[in-house]
């Protein structure tokens, strides 16, 4: 399987998982706690997949526009010295929020389009609140930490829909640019 097909399958799988859980119930209040937790985790898996896809596709599209540190971060690589003094690569530990912002920025840069994920909107605020829910579920300290409220489900679903839309918008802007360039090159060759 080539890298493009892997990316397509990855996005399809994580989005399908979210949709399966989210669409199973008519009302959010009907979603049992265990499935609320699964939904939050699945949505964050989707966010991580989107970040990976944006960074991978950016490197495939136009790697020459990036600085070495951008390439390393896009590959999620860090470097260290072994006990014998040899340089070696290790997996970078990237914080969620800056990594997501970076993924959108590097994808826009690769496609040379003017796009920036807005951090001044209520959807971004919902995403930030959702990060706290994800963190609480991932590192529970008391039984109440495992409860996901209806408001928290609303936030995480709003963040999901927004990131999904932003991903689509970025893709459409990139495609539009490609089609415009193709049309212009056909005009100049005629």
How would you describe each model-predicted region?
Residues 1-41, 58, 185-189:
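Charged alpha-helical initiation segments
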Residues 10-13, 17, 103, 159-162:
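Charge-rich, solvent-exposed alpha-helical interaction surfaces
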Residues 43-50:
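Hydrophobic alpha-helical packing segments in soluble, helical-rich domains
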Residues 56, 60, 147, 168-190:
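Long amphipathic alpha-helical segments
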Residues 62-136, 140, 144, 162-176:
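Flexible secondary-structure boundary motifs
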Residues 145-151:
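Short conserved catalytic/interaction loops centered on acidic-Pro-aromatic/His motifs
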Residues 151-167:
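Short secondary-structure subsegments characteristic of cysteine-rich extracellular domains
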């Amino acid at each position: 399987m080539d890298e493009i097909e892997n990316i397509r399958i990855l996005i399809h799988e994580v989005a399908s998982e979210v949709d399966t859980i989210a669409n199973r119930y008519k009302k959010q209040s009907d979603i049992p706690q265990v499935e609320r937790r699964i939904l939050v985790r699945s949505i964050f898996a989707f966010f991580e997949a989107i970040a990976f896809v944006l960074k991978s596709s950016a490197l495939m599209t136009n790697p020459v526009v990036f600085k070495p540190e951008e390439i390393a971060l896009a590959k999620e690589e860090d470097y260290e010295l072994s006990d014998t003094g040899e340089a070696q690569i290790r997996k970078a530990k990237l914080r969620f929020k800056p990594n997501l912002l970076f993924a959108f920025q590097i994808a826009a840069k690769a496609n040379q389009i003017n796009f920036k994920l807005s951090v001044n909107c209520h959807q971004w605020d919902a995403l930030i609140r959702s990060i706290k829910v994800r963190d609480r579920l991932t590192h529970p300290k008391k039984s109440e930490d495992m409860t996901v409220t209806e408001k928290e489900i609303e936030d995480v679903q709003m963040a999901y829909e927004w990131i999904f839309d932003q991903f689509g918008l970025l893709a459409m802007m990139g495609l539009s640019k490609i089609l415009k360039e193709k049309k212009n090159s056909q005009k100049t060759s005629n």
